[in-house]
Amino acid sequence: MQQTNPAAVGDYLRKLQQEIVAAVEAADGGTCVRDAWQKEPGEALQGSGLTCILEGGALFERAGCGFSQVRGPRLPPSATQNRPELAGAPFEAMGVSLVFHPRNPYVPIVHMNVRMLAALPEGKDPVCWFGGGMDLTPCYGFEDDAVHFHTVCRDALAPFGDDKYPRFKTWCDEYFFLKHRNEQRGIGGIFFDDFAEGGFDNGFALLRSVGNAFLPAYLPIIERRRAMPWGERERAFQLYRRGRYVEFNLVWDRGTHFGLQSGGRTESILLSMPPLASWAYQQQPEPGSPEAALYSDFIVRRDWL
């Protein structure tokens, strides 16, 4: 049986966070606030983390990238839906999670997460599994952006088998779906959870490949769109679409539920929230408009490659 090495995963995740935060600061010109935190003695979870956030920047209205490494006495229900035999076991969880909300409505929202969860059943070997992925949520869709993003995702997974991209792409489409709206959240990407195929070494290698692919997937899209002019109409639609992001994260997202159920740090869990969002009753885009094209051509399940 392969040895598990959670410490190596933690080292990698800290380094990944540093690289991404440096890239955010370089692209925006601003400086992230770095908030190192430690859980208080006696709390349900013990551990620490680093939250990095840039607010009010030239490029990013809000860009948060958090690392956390925590231990808890019992796995919460959201983590054992597929592994009932581990219900109630102590656990260790670590990960990097980010959401970037750009100021320009033509630059898409992006989300990325890579994580490891280790169940620590008494008297037994640790059981480790990995999860994560990345997905893109444009307010205004561009075919070449979608193709680029999905190409980088596919290439990151190629060393692990030809089945991984189509499988994780479908998983992403199914996961980032607003059931109450019957609507995709964005143009998708890749998503995986409870991944333990090939043992610890293979799972960790896949995690690294996905994490390392994030900047090549997103930075070229920023550069293509950041200088596009926009006005009140685009801003209003951006805020309306951000409302969908809020709905998904609070109603459907397992990561949000896991964090809140397990006594996680609320400020870090809600790092994904946009600074501003809006709702309008039964808003319908004008036929033939770029806003209408988002619904008909982009936030639908389709093969981009």
From Swiss-Prot:
Where the protein is mainly located, per its record?
cytoplasm
List the GO molecular function terms: coproporphyrinogen oxidase activity; metal ion binding; protein homodimerization activity
Q: Family assignment?
A: Belongs to the aerobic coproporphyrinogen-III oxidase family.
Protein's pathway: Porphyrin-containing compound metabolism; protoporphyrin-IX biosynthesis; protoporphyrinogen-IX from coproporphyrinogen-III (O2 route): step 1/1
Per its record, how is this protein called by name? Oxygen-dependent coproporphyrinogen-III oxidase
Q: Which organism is it from?
A: Variovorax paradoxus (strain S110)
> Quaternary state and partners of this protein?
Homodimer.
* Annotated a divalent metal cation binding sites: 101, 111, 150, 180
Q: Where is this site: Important for dimerization?
A: 180
The primary gene name is hemF
**UniProt-annotated binding residues for substrate:** 97, 113-115, 263-265
Extract the coiled-coil ranges from the record.
Answer: none
Q: Name one GO cellular component term.
A: cytoplasm
